[in-house]
Amino acid sequence: MMMRDGNISGPKKKKFTTKCRPFSFYKNRHIIMLINDESVYLYNLTLKPPSYYISSIVGQFYKQDNSTKNAQQLVLVSSTTLQLFEINEEAGKLELQSSQNLLGIINSIEKICLSEVDGVVITSDSGNLSILQYDNKTKKFISKIQEPMTKNGWGRNYVGENLAIDPENRCILVAAMEKNKLFYKIESNSSGSKELSSPLEAHSKQVLCLKIVALNTDHNNPLFGALELTPEKKCIINYYELDQGLNHVVKKKPNSSNSDPLPNDVNYLIPLPGHIGGMVVCGTNWCFYDKLDGPRIYLPLPRRNGQTQDSIIVNHVTHVLKKKKFFILLQNALGDLFKLTVDYDFDKEIIKNISITYFDTIPPALSLNIFKNGFLFANVLNNDKLLYQFEKLGDDLTEGELVINSSDYESLNSVRESVTSFKLKGLDNLALIDVLETLSPITDSKIIDSKLVTLSSHSYVKSITHGVPTTTLVESPLPITPTDIFTTKLSLESANDEYLVISSSLSSKTLVLSIGEVVEDVEDSEFVLDQPTIAVQQVGIASVVQIYSNGIKHVRTVNGNKKTTDWFPPAGITITHATTNNQQVLIALSNLSVVYFEIDATDDQLIEYQDRLEIATTITAMAIQENISEKSPFAIIGCSDETIQVVSLQEHNCLEIKSLQALSANSSSLKMLKSSGKETHVHIGMENGVYARIKIDTINGNLSNSRVKYIGSKPVSLSVIKFSNEIEGILAISSAPWISYLYRDSFKITPLLEIDITNGSSFISEDIGGEGIVGIKDNNLIIFSVGKEDSVFDPSQDLTIATTKLRYTPRKMITNGNRLFISESEYNVQGPFKCNINGDVKENVDEDYYEAFGYEWKQNSWASCIQVVDSKSNQVIQSLQLDGNESIVSMSAVSFNKTSTPSVPASHLVVGVCTNQTILPNSYDKSYLYTFKIGKKHLQLVHKTELDHIPQVLENFQDKLLVASGNHIRLYDIGQKQLLKKSTTIIDFSTNINKIIPQTNRIIICDSHKSSIVFAKFDESQNQFVPFADDVMKRQITSIMNLDIDTLIGGDKFGNIFVTRIDEDISKQADDDWTILKTQDGILNSCPYKLQNLIEFHIGDIITSFNLGCLNLAGTESVIYTGLQGTIGLLIPLVSKSEVELLFNLQLYMQQSQNNLVGKDHLKLRSYYNPIKNVIDGDLLERFLEFDISLKIEISRKLNKSVNDIEKKLIDLRNRSAF
């Protein structure tokens, strides 16, 4: 793959393309494929799914085998992904159990009670009503019911917009925003499974449905409350009752005594539990209880003391206690939680009083969930998700705390006129115990040193690195320079390691340390200390063997006394390599002989096998299975002829070579490990920095199904390590340490971060809290654990996120050397910071207060600033607060009269701002350009330039500032007091330019409304830009990037990705024959030439940035994109015709074989607005890895490939540029 930067010109223009023969045909059975040499073929993979969770629900979705309690789980659903978590009560953490890409766009989700466990009901763009149940064996949701209810796609009449389920599980209501409502009765068949009846229709013409809730009616007919809007723009409440006897839907209106007109600021409905029924209707600063044929009960909503902000309820959660008691937590848009309780007279069946008290303040959430075991999950809006634990229920109110009683209010007017305020307080009833890191929303990103740096969540810079964090526990110097390190326990029953053995081949010494509360020398180990140790192993019941260069020292403990036995090789012969487990010892001698020992189970003695194996070449490494209860049936021996040999250790053919495998280099380290009680793999570290894993058949010793990964420039050393009781893995050390492990049938290999060791060993000790790793670096001993300091190792997470807190919502990021310039603006917010663009100002701002309670809201107000972040230390080094009510709309680094390159940073930073800007309707008072000088340490204001237009786009073009607004493009140069206008161009057929990519003497213009993409060249004779080519398709573009000088990739606001290119001859003519080209007349109010459309693909998320690069070591350069909802994806160029053919045909068979959980056709999903073109969907293809073996074989036979070939291709594609 060859790519050229758009700012580099030259005589040749190399294309972003694949090397395929032109118009080649491939025929496999009935499939014919056309491949064009000029086309681009990409492979799409989702590296991180969207983390904007539209809903969260709690239920018992599966039963735990060894639990007597009815444990609850949490389901989080984004637009495309369904995830299931459970709470580890001991660690206080959320643990991911399952994550599924539904390959569809989810609209809403609710819980439904199935026969023994809970399931989920989903409405999606497939037009089906889907009921899913979790299968604990496969760790996946499976489809139980797919009920078609409407056509594919979205619309005002799409009935999946609102979803409500009767609390007694008798009926499901789905409703469109306009007109359509469908009622499905839930019935049980003879086998006890749930079925849906034919739908009953209830249409309301010319009425918009804003919200629907299912009401509790005990055993009466199912009833639903709806908030609706009439053509006169008046809000009304209607009730819909399903008459089960007549099988008919009845629309009912509130009691005549409750016919007071609703204020138009009503926004939320809250149903009450069964014995009470009815619902709470909420508006701005008020609420009332409403029940069909019952009186209304009014209450005001509390407001923050000393602030003018309204209290608007946006969220709630109901929790039922014992003896029919319950409480409801209401949350307003500011994040304040209020506890609503009802004093109910069971004898008279009336409500005596409703009270509201202030509970706590947490970040505003989309949904709240309470677990029976006392946890509260907050699905926080635009930030990390939070898990709290209840410390108390807020019943112990002190004197002076606010209590609102309904008995004090008689009408809606009295409630609306009342002002009830409360004083904010820190968390009192809740305690934060866990944070679920998310990226939504991502507004911009850059790749810096293989890290993806994003502007994401609410006011953060988040650096995403492939790797697992580590926590250093102990680091101390050693008296020798170590080359190897070992740990061992002294008896079979011991749970902890007791000896730490450090060997030095440089000084021919061995150091034995005891492991306990303190680490100290062992005086009575009986080990040989004046020679380097090759291996140490606890064998038998209570014995330890030390293998060193000149022999084996066997130390047995008998009745508390230590007895030693020595074994020596022949004179002049030394031991070079060894591998051991509790029952077997295998050593290699310098005369190329292999000697095998077994442990006598009766007295722990070493028994030498009489025959020896002679190897023809030098032995480089060897391994037998470790940490197993039985004997290893095979040994693996690495030889200097770049092969490994499988040697039998079974009685009938001991030391017989069974198979041989060629390698790409000599093996430097070998390990054999049984994975999750299923398959056994040989792990190979090679001298060229390659790590490989090969499956070994434990019956006949055959090797197959290899996986390779380049992990560094140095020879790879391997050690078996233990992460937990369930997971064992490999520590692989090259130029950096990595770990590999199998987790839920998925093999992961991940670098370790923030640690540098040259050798390591597993380390188990209660003093460090369990499993750890002990390593050496130079003359230092390092003990560390895998995972963050405050958490245990999570095998499902192989990405580490480092965060830097910002002030406001970040908009754009510019890299300039080692610094990041970040523009931040937030609407309807009044910032507490003072303007300091003209110099430093003393601040007295309690940032912890605003972090907890947020900034004060103010209508049509803006808070904006520029912050400078050091990309290496992730620290904010400068913050510039803007003056007054200014909003930042654009920013660019510019080199006036100086060429900017990655090694020569830009000289100035220009920021475009507007004053008193409003959105919907869009307006502003004035606009300016702030010009800052980029110094070595800080930004310094040079001058301020007033404009007569909004600076929508700023870019650096030919050492000048390019400013675009509407359909105008202007060039500015720097002056002493302000920027000086040098050129003006009007693009007649554009209306709203929102992106520009500068090239050497050309620019690529993007329009968000009309003309889509335009290529234009700067004509020096006319002193303006002349457009000469544009796109045939009109798009509303959100992000764009050059692939080469003629090819670009972009995304639009509807979630589509496209690649377009200008014809090579037209591009060459624009460079060589510009005089002729610029005189060509346009066609139909557009350019004379059109772009070629190469790629079309629907992602389902709004693309906010593209980057060229890779996220792994020595990977292939690919396109990495980010989405607004937190999506991170990868587009890998396919480089051969055979690769494209194989993946294309595999995709066809996968489309036929896979059952979509929501009933969405894959081709329709990826062709939402335009037919899919030249993109292979890796998300679909990787489901092949999850299929059962019979289906894998069926598909592979159709492709004339083996299952291993297809699996290897899919894994290699992922490893090509990512992880």
UniProtKB/Swiss-Prot annotation:
Q: Name one GO molecular function term.
A: U2 snRNA binding
Q: What is its main location?
A: nucleus
Give the Pfam families listed for this entry. Answer: Beta-prop_RSE1_1st, Beta-prop_RSE1_2nd, CPSF_A
Q: Which InterPro entries match?
A: Beta-prop_RSE1/DDB1/CPSF1_1st, Cleavage/polyA-sp_fac_asu_C, RSE1/DDB1/CFT1/CPSF1, WD40/YVTN_repeat-like_dom_sf
Asked if the record carries the keyword Nucleotide-binding, the reply is no
Keywords in alphabetical order: mRNA processing, mRNA splicing, Nucleus, Spliceosome
Q: Which GO terms describe its biological process?
A: mRNA splicing, via spliceosome
- Quote the subcellular location field of this record: Nucleus
Chain segments annotated as coiled-coil in the UniProt record: none
Q: Name one GO cellular component term.
A: nucleus
**Described purpose of this protein according to its UniProt entry:** Involved in pre-mRNA splicing and cell cycle control.
Q: Which family does it belong to?
A: Belongs to the RSE1 family.
Subunit structure comment from the entry: Associated with the spliceosome.
Question: Protein name, please?
Answer: Pre-mRNA-splicing factor RSE1
Native source organism of the sequence: Candida albicans (strain SC5314 / ATCC MYA-2876) (Yeast)
